[in-house]
Amino acid sequence: MKNKIITLGVLAEARIDESRTPLSPAQISYLLSKYSNLKIIVQPSKERCFKDKDYLKTGAQITDNLSSADIIFGVKEVDISTLIKDKTYLFFSHTSKVRQHIGQVIKDKAIIYKKELLKEVIKKNITLIDYENIRDTSGEGYRYLGFGRFAGIIGAYNTLNLYLKLNNKQQLPGAFEINNYEQVKKIISKQNFNKLKILLTGSGRASKGAIELLKYANVRQVS
């Protein structure tokens, strides 16, 4: 089935505060140029960080209907009511730890949602690939996909910006207003936080991302 047409679908995120996307226009353009048997359809979204027209320029199709997609990509948890039976989905479902709550009476809305999501996935014969579980099978099971580093970078940037505000100093542009990391580094490097004492805990991706940003902010690491 070498020449079989494979259709990829890109979801419009269910959360109104989510602007990220699993595939950028540049990535879609690359995929379509490399694989002649590939078709990509994208749900329209006003919240996404890229405009619908940016996807149209790549050759992708814009449509609400993803029923023809073989594989559907998202970022965060999907609206359960929109799940299409017999499909393969990839997104951060955060359902890995739900098993420990099976049989328990749960009031936490987030856990209730995840349990309902898994029930619907099973009911509709869906193959769910959670980005969180794409790991190296050796050693400590290193996660290949995660937002930790950038969460740390942006968290540190926003915290320093809040510090400026609380001390009645001129604030920097919000992180959401800056469209690339190089610009973030350029802006923060012009500030002087050398008298600020910061305690940073943890050793994961988020903390390493925060340390990375603080170096550009002229904050000296002492331990």
What spans do the regions from the language model cover?
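Hydrophobic beta-strand scaffold residues
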Residues: 40, 62, 127-129, 221
